[in-house]
């Protein structure tokens, strides 16, 4: 008989503990949801800020591309001039050898 009287007590304790845990889980899920919303807003703001720099990045890219093009052209011109000088020196040596 004592088992039957203690059984409702155990059930009540279990139900109270279950309800407390469910409430705690619910509170924690609400906190997680709030934090996810905050994170989402922050990511959206970061994306917007990044978009504001697209024009600046494009401008710098154009600048660097132009500078690289100038450097490449300068190297080609220098190489062509060196080849002309080298071939001119070779012709002078050949002419001197003939004399």
From Swiss-Prot:
* Disulfide partners: none
Region Disordered, annotated ranges: 69-99
Bias (Acidic residues) ranges: 89-99
Record carries keyword Chaperone: no
Give the phenotype of cells or organisms lacking this gene.
Inviable.
Cited InterPro entries: DASH_Dad1
| One annotated Gene Ontology cellular component of this protein | nucleus
Q: Where can this protein be found?
A: Chromosome, Centromere, Kinetochore; Cytoplasm, Cytoskeleton, Spindle; Nucleus
UniProt keyword list: Cell cycle, Cell division, Centromere, Chromosome, Cytoplasm, Cytoskeleton, Kinetochore, Microtubule, Mitosis, Nucleus
Q: Where is the composition biased (Basic and acidic residues)?
A: 73-83
Q: Does the keyword Transport apply?
A: no
Which terms under GO biological process does the entry name? cell division; filamentous growth; mitotic spindle organization
Q: Which family does it belong to?
A: Belongs to the DASH complex DAD1 family.
How it assembles, according to the record, is: Component of the DASH complex consisting of ASK1, DAD1, DAD2, DAD3, DAD4, DAM1, DUO1, HSK3, SPC19 and SPC34, with a stoichiometry of one copy of each subunit per complex. Multiple DASH complexes oligomerize to form a ring that encircles spindle microtubules and organizes the rod-like NDC80 complexes of the outer kinetochore. DASH complex oligomerization strengthens microtubule attachments. On cytoplasmic microtubules, DASH complexes appear to form patches instead of rings.
- Describe the task this protein carries out: Component of the DASH complex that connects microtubules with kinetochores and couples microtubule depolymerisation to chromosome movement; it is involved in retrieving kinetochores to the spindle poles before their re-orientation on the spindle in early mitosis and allows microtubule depolymerization to pull chromosomes apart and resist detachment during anaphase.
Name of the protein: DASH complex subunit DAD1
Q: Which organism is it from?
A: Candida albicans (strain SC5314 / ATCC MYA-2876)
| Taxonomic classification | Eukaryota, Fungi, Dikarya, Ascomycota, Saccharomycotina
């Amino acid at each position: 008989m004592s088992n039957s009287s203690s059984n409702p007590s155990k059930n009540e304790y279990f139900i109270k503990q279950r309800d407390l845990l469910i409430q705690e889980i619910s509170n924690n899920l609400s906190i997680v949801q709030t934090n996810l919303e905050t994170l989402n807003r922050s990511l959206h703001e970061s994306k917007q800020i990044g978009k504001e720099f697209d024009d600046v990045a494009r401008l710098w890219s154009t600048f660097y591309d132009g500078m690289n093009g100038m450097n490449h052209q300068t190297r080609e011109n220098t190489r062509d001039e060196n080849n002309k000088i080298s071939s001119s020196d070779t012709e002078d040596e050949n002419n001197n050898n003939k004399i």
